[in-house]
Amino acid sequence: MDAIKGSELQIPDAIFAWVLDGQGGVKPLADDDIIDKDKPCWLHLNYTHSDSADWLAATPLLPNNVRDALAGESTRPRVTRIGDGALITLRCINGSTDERPDQLVAMRLYMDERLIVSTRQRKVLALDDVLGDLKEGNGPTDGGSWLVEVCDALTDHASEFIEQLHDRIIDLEDDLLDQQVPPRGFLALLRKQLIVMRRYMAPQRDVYARLASERLPWMSDDQRRRMQDIAERLGRGLDEIDSCIARTAIMSDEIAQIMQESLARRTYTMSLMAMVFLPSTFLTGLFGVNLGGIPGNSWHLGFSLFCLMLVVVIGGVAWWLHRSKWL
């Protein structure tokens, strides 16, 4: 392939444009730089910015279908080989476990041995790890190692998020053992996060496995082995997600049972109270509607004696319920 001039990659509103120095570091792209396989260029764009969108639509450095894909709508993770290059769509975890599980942040990239063009709309936090290593001189040295490092960082963020969800499930299980029911919607949010993760991470694992098996000329055998390790690590995370989804289903049944038992206890308590006060209610009603006059109304101890009789009746009913083991 012919070398690319740095002036062809100068975009005013690019997020950044770096040239890998081949020793683990980077330097800003200059107009007189010559971009080749030994010193590839990483161009990171926000495809909603006007200059970046215009460059993507007009540059002859990218195939037509690649230009459309880099500025297109979000899709599930996938990889398409185009000659010696690859068009890749990946997903990154950006939020915390307290946030609603919006669609994971999408990053699209096209790369060959000379050029790496990545696009996004929202910030991809995992790229900060790779950028930090490059600025310290400990980063990738070529396109193949760059792709491995990016996929590794994405998997690290996904694994950390899955671990946080797993810890929350453990805490929730401990609370349920103590008969503590979580707030309404808590378990639904947790389950939704797991399902969204499963939806996007499963094809992303397949992307990693595909990259490990593709004989791309700018990836070495060692890099392909590392990519396979990353795919297997994400696969273990998916197994953990499946386990967590099953556990949330069990917890949902447990919460329903706890709520049903709580309602049954309240209903039972109200029934017992009705049984205790039913005789006294009957007596007071009977005395109150006596058309011939309330018995004992002319005796000064009549009301006191009636109250004492009610206490005896209530006590007798309570004793009978206790003896019958209803209380």
Curated annotation (Swiss-Prot):
Pfam families in alphabetical order: CorA
Q: What is the lineage of its organism?
A: Bacteria, Pseudomonadati, Pseudomonadota, Gammaproteobacteria, Enterobacterales
Q: Which residues lie on this side of the membrane: Periplasmic?
A: 295-300
Q: What is this protein called?
A: Zinc transport protein ZntB
State the organism of origin: Klebsiella pneumoniae subsp. pneumoniae (strain ATCC 700721 / MGH 78578)
- In which domain of life is the source organism classified? Bacteria
Q: Does the keyword Transport apply?
A: yes
Where's it found, cell-wise? Cell inner membrane
Where does the chain cross the membrane?
A: 274-294, 301-321
Keywords attached to this entry? Cell inner membrane, Cell membrane, Ion transport, Membrane, Transmembrane, Transmembrane helix, Transport, Zinc
Question: What is the similarity comment for this entry?
Answer: Belongs to the CorA metal ion transporter (MIT) (TC 1.A.35) family.
Where mainly found? membrane
Cystine connections: none
